[in-house]
UniProtKB/Swiss-Prot annotation:
Cofactor note as given: Binds 2 [4Fe-4S] clusters per subunit. One cluster is coordinated with 3 cysteines and an exchangeable S-adenosyl-L-methionine.
Keyword Cytoplasm found: yes
Organism: Proteus mirabilis (strain HI4320)
Any one Gene Ontology cellular component term annotated for this protein: cytoplasm
Annotated family: Belongs to the radical SAM superfamily. Lipoyl synthase family.
Taxonomic lineage from the root: Bacteria, Pseudomonadati, Pseudomonadota, Gammaproteobacteria, Enterobacterales
Name listed for the protein in its UniProt record: Lipoyl synthase
Subcellular localization(s) per the UniProt record: Cytoplasm
Keyword hit for Acyltransferase: no
InterPro entries, per database record: Aldolase_TIM (IPR013785), Elp3/MiaA/NifB-like_rSAM (IPR006638), LIAS_N (IPR031691), Lipoyl_synth (IPR003698), rSAM (IPR007197)
Gene name of the encoded protein: lipA
Molecular function, one GO term: 4 iron, 4 sulfur cluster binding
C-alpha cells in the first residue's frame, strides 16, 4: 500500500498527483482513449493575441487569478480577446479534488486581505461593466469564503458604481447558514452555483458534494432575494442520459432557478475523467427548447457554453451558444 501524499501548504497538486488523492479512481479504457472530437468541437483561435496578453499581464501585475486559465477553459482565447474574464478569488488551490476539474488541489494559503481592493481596481482599469467572480472551494475557512466574496462585492461596487456582478459560488458545505447570512446585505446581481451533473454520477464526478445540498443553497438564496436571478449549469458527456439532464432541469425549476447553462465536458488531461460522449448541437438545441418550456428565463446550451461564457449577454437574455 503506497503512502498518502503529504501535502504542503501553497503547493498546487495537478493531474496524476491530484487524481491519486481521489478515493474513487478514474479508470480509462481503450475505447475512451480513442474517442475523438467531432468537427463541431474544433476551435479557431483569434489571430490577434494582444488583448489576451494584456489581460494576462493585468492579472499577474495584481496577483489575481482567472478561472479561465486555472481551469483550462476552451473559450479563454475568445473571451480574453473580447476583453472579458472571470476572476477567481481566494487563491488558485482548491480543497476539493473533483476529477473533471483542472484547478489545482492542495492546502491553500490564507486569503489575501488586499485582494478585494486589487480586484476592484483591476476591474476599473479594464473598464468592465459586467464581471463574474468565482472561487475555489475553501473548506478550510469557517465561512467557506463567504465574507471574502462579500468584501470583494463591496470593494468592486465602491470603485465601479454602475457595474453588475455575478457570483459563481462553491457549495459552502456545512456552512450554508453562515454564508447566506453574510451575503444578506451584499448580494450579487446574479447568484450562480453549478450542479455540474446528474445525481447518479455525483460520487464519481463531484466527490465531497451533495446534489440536494446544492439545490437547497440555490433555493434558500432565492427565497431571501426573490428579485435576484439564480443560475446553475451542467457539463454533459460524463455518462449521464438526456432524460437525466431534463430531470435535473426540472429540479432546478422546482428550486426557483431561472437561468441555465449546458455545455460539453472536455477532458483536461489523460488523468481526468474521460469523455463518455460528445453531445451534438441538435441535442443541445433540444435541451434549450425543453428548458424554456419549463419556465427558465434564459438557457445557454451548446458545446462550448460554460457558466460564465458571455455571462453579460446571458444576463440580458441574449442568445448564447
Amino acid at each position: 500500500m503506497s503512502k498518502p501524499i503529504q501535502m504542503e501548504r501553497g503547493v498546487k497538486y495537478r493531474d496524476a498527483d491530484k487524481m491519486a488523492l481521489i478515493p474513487v479512481k478514474t479508470i480509462v479504457t481503450e475505447r475512451e482513449e480513442l474517442l475523438r472530437k467531432p468537427e463541431w468541437m474544433k476551435i479557431k483561435l483569434p489571430a490577434d493575441s494582444s488583448k489576451i496578453q494584456g489581460i494576462k499581464a493585468a492579472m499577474r501585475k495584481n496577483g489575481l487569478h482567472s478561472v479561465c486559465e486555472e481551469a483550462s477553459c476552451p473559450n479563454l482565447a475568445e473571451c480574453f480577446n473580447h476583453g472579458t474574464a472571470t476572476f477567481m478569488i481566494l487563491g488558485a488551490i482548491c480543497t476539493r479534488r473533483c476529477p473533471f476539474c483542472d484547478v489545482a488541489h492542495g492546502r491553500p494559503n490564507a486569503p489575501d486581505p488586499q485582494e478585494p481592493i486589487k480586484l476592484a481596481q483591476t476591474i476599473k482599469d479594464m473598464g468592465l461593466r459586467y464581471v463574474v467572480i468565482t472561487s475555489v472551494d475553501r473548506d478550510d475557512l469557517r465561512d467557506g469564503g463567504a465574507q471574502h466574496f462579500a468584501d470583494c462585492i463591496t470593494a468592486i461596487r465602491e470603485k465601479n458604481p454602475n457595474i453588475r456582478i455575478e457570483t459563481l459560488v462553491p457549495d459552502f458545505r456545512g456552512r450554508m447558514d453562515k454564508a447566506l447570512e453574510i451575503l444578506t446585505d451584499t448580494p450579487p446581481d446574479v447568484f450562480n452555483h453549478n450542479l455540474e451533473n446528474v445525481p447518479r454520477v455525483y460520487r464519481q464526478v463531484r466527490p465531497g458534494a451533495n446534489y440536494q445540498w446544492s439545490l437547497t443553497l440555490l433555493e434558500r438564496f432565492k427565497q431571501a432575494h426573490p428579485n435576484i436571478p439564480t443560475k446553475s449549469g451542467l457539463m454533459v458527456g460524463l455518462g449521464e442520459t438526456n432524460e437525466e439532464i431534463i430531470d435535473v432541469m426540472r429540479d432546478l425549476r422546482k428550486h426557483g432557478v431561472t437561468m441555465l447553462t449546458l455545455g460539453q465536458y472536455l477532458q483536461p488531461s489523460r488523468h481526468h475523467l474521460p469523455v463518455q460522449r460528445y453531445v451534438s448541437p441538435d441535442e443541445f438545441e433540444y435541451m434549450k427548447e425543453q428548458a424554456l418550456a419549463m419556465g427558465f428565463t434564459h438557457a445557454a446550451c451548446g458545446p462550448f457554453v460554460r457558466s460564465s461564457y458571455h455571462a453579460d449577454l446571458q444576463a440580458q437574455g441574449i442568445e448564447v451558444k
